[in-house]
């Protein structure tokens, strides 16, 4: 029997995802029309013998999360539970804290996945690889190739070219170490907890030497820095390298990029989710997702890479490209929406133009990843995708360029390169 | 009667339009700038127009030949070998201007207003002195040279360049009428009429100011060209409302050539001029723009305060604003944003221009 854990973080995380994470927990933000973690859940549901999925995070239990989990259980026919940490315990602390829950029922192995990644999830190949590389005594990290400069933003893995054993692991190094990076998707045997326990005990000893230490801090464990770093070179940690699509989803801009990756997978995984140009319907270019309840005028032109949410209204002569339109939004006639996330229940007036600048990976470098690091460079807002928060109103005929509009704002003029509070 | 129009040089400030045609032939409200002046002159009884030009232009010459026939008047070209400024051209054309002893008009070429030529003749004859300058009121006199004159008679006392304290709010509008005697003051060399001739005439009590009623604009650069268009269309509204286009989707003063085609669900105006053979596709929004002959605006584009030069093409969902000027035969690809772009003729634009700049 197998299990999976998805690390979903909590409300204090995902700041680069503001203002969208104000309205919905980031793991539920729709990417290619479905909540970010639904892609993980669906991939898990396809793994034979995977019996339970545990979401671990420090969100207060909330309506959005529970109703999503309920729906997902029914749709994917797999048990799903949310386990709440009493505070942020780090990427290793949460699974250690809930180790009994994870191990109950006796799984031979379990996956651990960061919620904020987009991937083709090669879970079955990882299982096969695990069997061939040590089985119950070994652990597998999904790795991929990055370019030299961008590798510094990730966990970097040096591996034996033949055995794929991880010889050295370093998280976000200051100088180049390796172009193989950690994808935030792991396959562990239950024995991993012995190694996490070592870290836990070491923390405890160190903290006893300090004054005023709180017992809580002993529970904060980072999988990457505390566990992988010490496991490297001990014949237990292996990297399974994938060529499949992969990206982090840190910024709102990377959500548009991740949508593009998932939409292009839909061609083979979910052709029914892709819209096509039909008699009496809108013109579709490339990959487009339209929620069945959305109302799209036949004279609108959508795509490539557009996701239209529930109950969205798209008026006559509207153009949408490289954008996510969240549920309840209204795009009035002749408006033009490019490289933008239109927030829930927002309105874009007639002939308005809402446009952002994509931060796409360098198309000429197959190993390039999306940069989603800083909002500001030299004190200036770096041109990014435009984000309209929830319930924002854009008047007719204005242009909103490279801007972030916080929720519930009614604008009365054009804005460029600004954060509008 | 005769009139001399100071056509001057290359019209660089109205580029990129003047890279395709000489400035006097640039269409202003669906008629070459020069014809606005020439037709008004003809109406006031002028039968000989002299164009003072400092460059050769076959296009201008050919066009003027046709206008000669059409209007039944004589049009002469007075070519300078070197630019003679605003006064020198009068000396060069001396023979033509003194064929009889009538007073003659002198005009700056890019001025648009309700030309008061008949009133000028009356006013000039009434005071009987050498020269009359038409003056117009401005809001910010400190930016201009102002004319100080006696309110009753109009006799000019002096000129003050960029006054720092208020002395007058009237400026020289570039429309004059002179008696032939003025030619004795002007030598055949580069001379500025404003700086070198007028002050002396004023001192001798030979120069009078006549105040212009109604609008006035020097349309020598794109921004002012558009402002002038708004003023001109407003005066059309008063004098010839039947020239303006009305109907669903049209707002305010809009001039549309009868050969233009307008699509469904457009919203056009206020202050728009659409030239002959222009095609405006469905769902286009235009305000405060001039669209010149043969251009096409593709569906759902949005244009404000822009000039689309001859035979250009603006793509679907393009947004153009802030005095964007397209030269002749420019193609703007779909979905682009042009903010204050100045695009030279025969260019194809495939990237947005988010900040004002020149596209070579
Ligand atoms: N449950 C839980 N998840 C976390 C915690 N910290 C980070 N995560 C999740 O782990 C993943 C990786 O986060 P993190 O290591 O902080 O960011 P990265 O190193 O920039 O990828 C994300 O999906 C986070 O939501 C935590 O304290 N508890
Ligand atoms: N023929 C001729 N016309 C000129 C010359 N210089 C200026 N002009 C014209 O005289 C008018 C007034 O010119 P100027 O005083 O330079 O004003 P501006 O060009 O409107 O700033 C304009 O119509 C010019 O085209 C010249 O050297 N020769
Ligand atoms: Mg991390």
UniProtKB/Swiss-Prot annotation, chain A:
Pfam families: GMPPB_C (PF25087), NTP_transferase (PF00483)
Keyword list, A-Z: Cytoplasm
Annotated stretches, region: Substrate-binding domain: 2-252
GO molecular function: transferase activity
GO cellular component: cytoplasm
Localization (cell): Cytoplasm
Region (C-loop): 357-385
Primary localization: cytoplasm
Record InterPro entries: GMPPB_C, Hexapep_transf_CS, Mannose-1P_guanyltransferase, NTP_transferase_dom, Nucleotide-diphossugar_trans
Residues the record lists as binding GDP-alpha-D-mannose: 85, 248
GO process annotations (BP): biosynthetic process
Function: Regulatory subunit of the GMPPA-GMPPB mannose-1-phosphate guanylyltransferase complex; reduces the catalytic activity of GMPPB when part of the complex. Mediates allosteric feedback inhibition of GMPPB catalytic activity upon binding GDP-alpha-D-mannose. Together with GMPPB regulates GDP-alpha-D-mannose levels.
Family statement drawn from the similarity comment of this UniProt entry: Belongs to the transferase hexapeptide repeat family.
Protein name (database record): Mannose-1-phosphate guanylyltransferase regulatory subunit alpha
Species in which this protein is naturally found: Xenopus tropicalis
Curated annotation (Swiss-Prot), chain B:
Residues engaged in binding GDP-alpha-D-mannose: 110, 218
Residues at the active site: 162
Cofactor note text: Coordinates binding with substrate and required for enzymatic activity.
Segments forming a coiled coil: none
Alphabetical GO biological process terms: GDP-mannose biosynthetic process
Pathway it works in: Nucleotide-sugar biosynthesis; GDP-alpha-D-mannose biosynthesis; GDP-alpha-D-mannose from alpha-D-mannose 1-phosphate (GTP route): step 1/1
Assembly notes: Component of the GMPPA-GMPPB mannose-1-phosphate guanylyltransferase complex composed of 4 gmppa subunits and 8 gmppb subunits; the complex is organized into three layers, a central layer made up of 2 gmppa dimers sandwiched between two layers each made up of 2 gmppb dimers. Catalytic activity of gmppb is reduced when part of the complex and binding of GDP-alpha-D-Mannose by gmppa induces allosteric feedback inhibition of gmppb.
Function according to Swiss-Prot or TrEMBL: Catalytic subunit of the GMPPA-GMPPB mannose-1-phosphate guanylyltransferase complex. Catalyzes the formation of GDP-mannose, an essential precursor of glycan moieties of glycoproteins and glycolipids. Can catalyze the reverse reaction in vitro. Together with GMPPA regulates GDP-alpha-D-mannose levels.
Protein name, entry field: Mannose-1-phosphate guanylyltransferase catalytic subunit beta
Organism of derivation: Xenopus tropicalis
């Amino acid at each position: 029997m197998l299990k999976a854990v998805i690390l979903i973080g909590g409300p204090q995380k995902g700041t680069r995802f503001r203002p969208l994470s104000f309205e919905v927990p980031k793991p539920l933000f729709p990417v290619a029309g479905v909540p970010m973690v639904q892609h993980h859940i669906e991939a898990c549901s396809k793994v034979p013998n995977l019996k339970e999925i545990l979401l671990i995070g420090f969100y207060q239990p909330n309506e959005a999360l529970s109703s999503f989990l309920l729906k997902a259980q029914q749709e994917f026919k797999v048990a799903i539970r949310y386990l709440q940490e009493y505070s942020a315990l780090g990427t290793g602390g949460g699974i250690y804290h809930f180790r009994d829950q994870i191990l109950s029922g006796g799984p031979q192995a379990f996956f651990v996945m960061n919620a904020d990644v987009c991937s083709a999830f090669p879970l079955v190949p990882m299982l096969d690889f695990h069997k061939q590389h040590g089985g119950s005594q070994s652990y597998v990290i999904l790795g991929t190739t990055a370019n030299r400069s961008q590798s510094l933003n990730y966990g970097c893995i040096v591996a034996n070219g033949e055995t794929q054993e991880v010889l050295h692991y370093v998280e976000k190094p200051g100088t180049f170490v390796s172009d193989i990076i950690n994808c935030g998707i792991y396959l562990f045997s239950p024995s991993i907890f012995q190694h996490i326990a070592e870290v836990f005990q070491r923390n405890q000893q160190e903290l006893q030497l300090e004054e005023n230490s709180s017992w809580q801090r002993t529970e904060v464990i980072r999988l990457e820095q505390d566990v992988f770093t010490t496991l490297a070179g001990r014949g237990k940690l292996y990297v399974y390298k994938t060529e499949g699509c992969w990206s982090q989803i840190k910024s709102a801009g990377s959500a548009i990029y991740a949508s593009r990756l998932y939409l292009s997978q839909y061609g083979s995984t979910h052709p029914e989710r892709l819209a096509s140009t039909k008699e009496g319907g809108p013109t579709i270019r490339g990959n487009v997702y339209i929620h069945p309840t959305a109302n799209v005028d036949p004279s609108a032109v959508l795509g490539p890479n557009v996701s239209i949410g529930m109950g969205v209204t798209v008026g006559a002569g509207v153009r949408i490209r490289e954008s996510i339109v969240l549920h309840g939004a209204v795009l009035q006639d002749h408006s033009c929406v490019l490289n933008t996330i239109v927030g829930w229940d927002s309105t874009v007036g007639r002939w308005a133009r809402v446009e952002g600048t994509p931060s796409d990976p360098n198309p000429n470098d197959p190993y390039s990843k999306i940069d989603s690091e800083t909002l500001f460079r030299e004190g200036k807002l770096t041109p990014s995708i435009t984000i309209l928060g929830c319930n924002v109103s854009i008047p007719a005929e204005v242009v909103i360029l490279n801007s972030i509009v916080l929720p519930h704002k009614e604008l009365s003029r054009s804005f460029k390169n600004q954060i509008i509070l | 009667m005769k009139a001399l129009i100071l056509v001057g040089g290359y019209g660089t400030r109205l580029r990129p339009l003047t890279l395709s045609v000489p400035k006097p032939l640039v269409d202003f409200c669906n008629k070459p700038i020069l014809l606005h002046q020439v037709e008004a002159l003809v109406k006031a009884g002028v039968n000989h127009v002299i164009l003072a030009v400092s460059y050769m232009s076959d296009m201008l010459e050919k066009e003027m030949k046709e206008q000669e026939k059409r209007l039944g008047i004589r049009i002469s070209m007075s070519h300078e070998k070197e630019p003679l400024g605003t006064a020198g051209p009068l000396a060069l054309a001396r023979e033509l201007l003194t064929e009889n002893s009538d007073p003659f008009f002198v005009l700056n070429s890019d001025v648009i207003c309700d030309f008061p030529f008949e009133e000028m003749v009356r006013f000039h004859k009434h005071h009987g002195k050498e020269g009359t300058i038409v003056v117009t009121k401005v809001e910010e006199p400190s930016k201009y040279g102002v004319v100080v004159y006696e309110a009753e008679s109009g006799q000019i006392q002096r000129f003050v360049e960029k006054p720092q304290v208020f002395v007058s709010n009237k400026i020289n509008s570039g429309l004059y009428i002179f008696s032939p005697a003025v030619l004795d003051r002007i030598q055949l060399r580069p001379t500025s009429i404003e700086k070198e001739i007028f002050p002396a005439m004023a001192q001798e009590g030979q120069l009078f100011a006549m105040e212009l009623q109604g609008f006035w604009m020097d349309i020598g650069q794109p921004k002012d060209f558009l402002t002038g268009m708004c003023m001109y269309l407003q005066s059309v509204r008063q004098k010839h409302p039947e020239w303006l286009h009305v109907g669903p989707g049209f707002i305010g003063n809009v001039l549309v050539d009868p050969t233009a085609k307008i699509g469904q669900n457009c919203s056009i105006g206020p202050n728009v001029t659409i030239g002959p053979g222009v095609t405006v596709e469905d769902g286009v929004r235009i305000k405060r723009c001039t669209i010149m002959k043969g251009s096409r605006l593709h569906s759902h584009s949005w244009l404000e305060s822009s000039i689309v030069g001859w035979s250009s093409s603006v793509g679907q969902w393009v947004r153009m604003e802030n005095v964007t000027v397209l030269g002749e035969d420019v193609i703007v690809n779909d979905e682009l944003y042009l903010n204050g772009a100045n695009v030279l003729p025969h260019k194809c634009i495939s990237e947005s221009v988010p900040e004002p700049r020149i596209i070579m």
